[in-house]
Amino acid sequence: MTGVQTCALPIWASVQLALIKNAARPIPYTKRDNVASDYASRTMYWSGPIVLAFVIFHLLQFTAGVIHPGSQFIEGDVYHNVVAGFQVWWVSAWYIFAVSLLGLHLSHGISAMFQSLGLSHPRYTPLLNKAAVAIAAAIVLGFISVPISVLLQVVK
């Protein structure tokens, strides 16, 4: 699967889900009650477009070299480009914010994946939801360690 397909698939799926949801109940509820939903699931609609914008920015900065605040983009020198990019505070802040949102997005997606695989059971679901949060947190911590290390000058 290509990167474009990877980005397009969740967009297509969310549009399809919204269409099915609206067709099933064209009249909205008078009172919105979020008893069964968690914060991650309630933020999917707005975190998705922000994560997409982040992916586009990330590709333009680190792959295409179109955006290179702070210094010159050097084709093929990934180490230089990453360090130079993350030395700009707002790039690091944007990256940390977006990856944190990605973590919320992933925790919901991983939890939904377990349910889609039929692993939903009153005994196992709470453990699987905690596993989804732990997996997403590990991914977030791994990815944000890079800009934090550059900002703290651990990586130069």
Locations of regions flagged by a protein language model:
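Short, small-residue-biased leader/transition segments that mark boundaries at the very start
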Residues: 2-3, 7-9
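Divalent metal-coordination and catalytic microenvironments
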Residues: 10, 58, 105
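Membrane-interfacial helix termini and the short, flexible loops that connect transmembrane helices
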Residues: 15-39, 66-73, 110-130, 154-155
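Transmembrane alpha-helix/helix-exit interface in multi-pass inner-membrane proteins
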Residues: 18, 43-72
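Interfacial and helix-entry/exit segments of alpha-helical transmembrane bundles
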Residues: 32-53, 127-140
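Alpha-helical transmembrane segments of helical membrane proteins, especially in multi-pass transport
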Residues: 61, 87-109
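Membrane-interface interhelical connector segments
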Residues: 64-88
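Juxtamembrane boundary at the C-terminal end of a transmembrane helix
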Residues: 142-156
